[in-house]
C-alpha cells in the first residue's frame, strides 16, 4: 500500500540503489522528496524543478533515475506482482521506461536515453536473468529531457512486497555500478 514513510515506500528502493553506487565510489544525489504527495497532479512538474535545481548546481550529472512502482492488475482488480527468482529470493521485476519524441516534446536526447536503457537492461539481464520486463518505449516525456541518461524505472507493481522491491533495488544498483564502471564514466 502507498505510504509517506520513506522506509516503507519507493524512497527505500532508491536508498538501496544509492548505497550500491556509493560503495563503488560513484557520486550520488538521492533526492527523497515525495513529488506525488499529496496529489499526483503536477508531480512531474514538481520533480522537474527538483532535477533542474540539481543540474544547475552540478552540471556534470549524466544520469537521472525516477523510481516508481507500476500499477497493474487483472480485469477483476486482482493486483499483479511481477517477480523473478534471483539467487533463491523473490525480486520485483523492473521495467525501464524510455521516452521518445515525435518532434513536439523538446526531447532531442531521446536516442541517448534509449541506448542507455538498452545497455542497462542488458547489464541487469546478464547479471540477473529474468530481473527485467521489456523496455517500455513511448511518446512520453517524464522529465527524460534533462540528461542523456534519464530513465524512469518501475520496481514491480503495487502487488509486490516492499522486500521484493528493495531486493530489486540492490540488484539494480549493482548492475548500474557495473555498467557505469565498464564505460569509464
Regions found by a protein language model. Name each.
Residues 1-62, 71-76, 170, 183:
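N-terminal catalytic or cofactor-binding beta/alpha core of small enzyme domains
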Residues 1-3, 30-33, 92, 96-106:
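Acidic/histidine-rich, surface-exposed loop or edge segments in extracytoplasmic proteins
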Residues 24-27, 59-63, 92-93, 130-131, ...:
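Loop/turn elements at helix/coil->beta-strand transitions in domains of secreted/extracellular proteins
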Residues 28-30, 63-66, 95-97, 134, ...:
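Structural recognition of the beta-strand scaffold that forms the well-ordered cores
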Residues 34-38, 69-74, 101-104, 140-143, ...:
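Solvent-exposed loop/turn segments at secondary-structure junctions
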Residues 51, 57-101:
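Active-site microenvironments of hydrolase-like enzyme catalytic domains
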Residues 109-136:
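Active-site-adjacent substrate-binding region
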Residues 132-185:
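Active-site-adjacent mobile loop/cap segments within catalytic or ligand-binding domains
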Amino acid at each position: 500500500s502507498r505510504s509517506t514513510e520513506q522506509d516503507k515506500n519507493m524512497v527505500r528502493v532508491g536508498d538501496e540503489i544509492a548505497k550500491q553506487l556509493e560503495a563503488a565510489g560513484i557520486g550520488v544525489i538521492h533526492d527523497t522528496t515525495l513529488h506525488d504527495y499529496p496529489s499526483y497532479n503536477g508531480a512531474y512538474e514538481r520533480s522537474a524543478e527538483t532535477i533542474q535545481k540539481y543540474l544547475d548546481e552540478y552540471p556534470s550529472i549524466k544520469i537521472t533515475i525516477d523510481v516508481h512502482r507500476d500499477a497493474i492488475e487483472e480485469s477483476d482488480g486482482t493486483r499483479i506482482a511481477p517477480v523473478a527468482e534471483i539467487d533463491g529470493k523473490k525480486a520485483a521485476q523492473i521495467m525501464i521506461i524510455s521516452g521518445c519524441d515525435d518532434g513536439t516534446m523538446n526531447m532531442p536526447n531521446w536516442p541517448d536515453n534509449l541506448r542507455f536503457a538498452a545497455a542497462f537492461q542488458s547489464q541487469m539481464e546478464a547479471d540477473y536473468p529474468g530481473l527485467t520486463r521489456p523496455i517500455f518505449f513511448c511518446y512520453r516525456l517524464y522529465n527524460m529531457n534533462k540528461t542523456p541518461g534519464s530513465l524512469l524505472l518501475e520496481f514491480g507493481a503495487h502487488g509486490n512486497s516492499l522486500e521484493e522491491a528493495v531486493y530489486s533495488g540492490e540488484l539494480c544498483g549493482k548492475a548500474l555500478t557495473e555498467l557505469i564502471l565498464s564505460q569509464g564514466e
